[in-house]
Amino acid sequence: MIVSGLPASGKSTLARALAEELGLPLLDKDEILESLYDSLGVGDHDWRRRLSRAGDDVLFRLAARTRGAVLDNWWHHETAPARLRELGGRLVEVFCDCDPALAAERFQARTRHPGHLDRRQSPEQVAERVAVIRATFPGPLRLGGPLLAVDTNDRVDPATVTRRLAPLLAAPVLPG
């Protein structure tokens, strides 16, 4: 299961809850990345970018060795779909969507590892960055499998999402 959406759209919160509801392991790119920061240190934006790419590689390696998992990441639309399809099996996408202003508000309010470099930006810069990302954001990854869009503007009930996912998860995997 692939959880996608804008930064601060509620991906990690929903992914954790779905993994628990479904009894699946959670592979969270931020957890991997923060572990790399702890081991290798916090640096500038170029360092962050390098560790982020390494974190992506670790995430995909773990996913390739895991039969059934919830994957949480800020996916790159240029590269992620092909890499995800290479994993094989059923790719069910859960797309988290929320208002860009709310995403900017959440982004500014959240506390993350210092390696993410979030606090180096003013609230205005964060709002502008999220608005630019949203304006150019292509939406769901559209991996060719089932897609469930979830409005994450308000609190989401994981049990309700799990019920909506049940028929998507139960459908047979078609070759090809």
Predicted regions and their residues:
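Hydrophobic anchor at the beta1->P-loop junction of P-loop NTPases
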Residues: 3
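P-loop (Walker A) phosphate-binding loop of NTP-binding proteins
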Residues: 6
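Conserved glycine(s) of the Walker
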Residues: 10
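Conserved substrate/cofactor phosphate-moiety recognition/catalytic segment
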Residues: 13-65
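Glycine-rich phosphate-binding loop used to anchor ATP phosphates in small-molecule kinases
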Residues: 50-91, 96-97
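Switch/connector loops and helix/strand junctions flanking conserved nucleotide-binding motifs
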Residues: 100-107, 158
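Small-molecule kinase domains that catalyze NTP-dependent phosphoryl transfer to phosphate-bearing small molecules
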Residues: 112-161
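C-terminal accessory "lid"/substrate-recognition subdomains
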Residues: 166-176
